Amino acid sequence: MSFTLAIVGRPNVGKSTLFNRLVGKKLALVDDQPGVTRDLREGEARLGDLRFTVIDSAGLEDATDNSLEGRMRRLTERAVEMADVCLFLIDARAGVTPTDEVFAEILRKKSAHVILAANKSEGSAADAGVLEAYGLGLGEPIRMSGEHGEGLNDLYSELLPVSEKFEKLAEETAPETDVVLDEDENEAFNAGEEIAATPVPTLEKPLQVAVVGRPNAGKSTLINKILGEDRLLTGPEAGITRDAISLKIDWSGTPMRIFDTAGMRKKAKVQEKLEKLSVSDGLRAVKFAEVVVVLLDAAIPFEQQDLRIADLAEREGRAVVIAVNKWDIEDEKQEKLKALKEAFERLLPQLRGAPLVTVSAKTGRGLDRLHAAIMKAHDVWNRRVPTAALNRWLAGMLEQHPPPAPQGKRIKLRYMTQAKTRPPGFVVMCSHPDKMPASYNRYLVNGLREDFDMPGTPIRLTLRGQGDKNPYKGKKKSTPSRLRKHLEGRKS
């Protein structure tokens, strides 16, 4: 496995800027406001030929109470404990501050390997701050500029001996979606007339799950309960998680990567620039996930923003699980559950049959049901149906309810096959596909859900005409050139 590097330092010394440079993507929020990064955040970093995990920590604040700064400080200490190496950043232009000295002492006690770096050291104005850094007792500081990429060669030299102690870890990739089925594999599968097994999550390719919802729905509390440790910031302040945090866990024997996203508010309420960045981060987490857990607040479920989040996940083609949190404080549970199911079917018909489970992130009740629902949704998302079974089913559907004949043109549905998985995608060859009403499409999709046990997952149904394979269909004939017109004119 690769080593882990934690970037630590007081607020606004350039930790997130360096994190983004190492990761190669804008994965951490960057702003001039101190304390922008409020959670521990992991990414796969590249530095030359080195590959390692980097943690962007909350800014070290000299606070010990239960304030947000105090919790940030405790999380940073947790990052130091998790890491193999700590990169301690100071601001060379500001020089060594009393806060830097306090936390240099903490790092000496808690971390076996500390690399000291004087960031923002471009130009002669930083020389005095670099010299002051020697007084911290952490060795010779590296002169760096995370913004301009200076000092990375020196950082490489420091990390190379560490890297040699660890095996290289293969870079993680985004989950495969809209997987086109191989024709040869399809033939073998169809001959067996069996539903293919769902790919089993592994440590190298864990099941990727995004937990999304409105602010303060309990997303971080839920994940902390699954983890069994206080990894993410939790508290009464709405919108406390501003980044989409990715965590690898083993949940009941299933390797998973879980994304805890920023609470998605209505656009009208997203005033602060940072929160706008976080909402887009949450949308991106949905795209990275295979299964999306939409977490609702039992007291105010299915608000407009909840519906938009669930619809977004469906449009992105992800498996969806609806989880209703704070169930422990509900009094009339049976009546409430009945009302929730009725509202779900009425407000989100496109997710008909998706799992709806009740949980309490505070007490941990219902987590086993949530795990089972995620695994079921993932299984359905990967579902494959034999072509022969599809065409027998199609014949029955046509007999039960023949397609309409718009403008007197009879639509013939001739053949059906599955073209994709993740989510399931089907193709029907027919005449006049452009004339097929949307209501008949829904009839077929709902039938697929019920008859092949595919509740809740997005199902893509494409109608194709007989001539769709003709590459010249719809192309204009080439017009005669001027030379050709001239020659034909001379002949006449």
Swiss-Prot record:
Residues 461-492 are annotated as: Disordered. GO terms for molecular function: GTP binding. Gene3D superfamilies: 3.30.300.20, P-loop containing nucleotide triphosphate hydrolases. GO terms for biological process: ribosome biogenesis. InterPro entries: G_ENGA (IPR031166), GTP-bd (IPR006073), GTPase_Der (IPR016484), KH_dom-like (IPR032859), KH_dom-like_a/b (IPR015946), P-loop_NTPase (IPR027417), Small_GTP-bd (IPR005225). Belongs to the TRAFAC class TrmE-Era-EngA-EngB-Septin-like GTPase superfamily. EngA (Der) GTPase family. Associates with the 50S ribosomal subunit. This is GTPase Der. It comes from Ruegeria sp. (strain TM1040) (Silicibacter sp.). The gene is der.
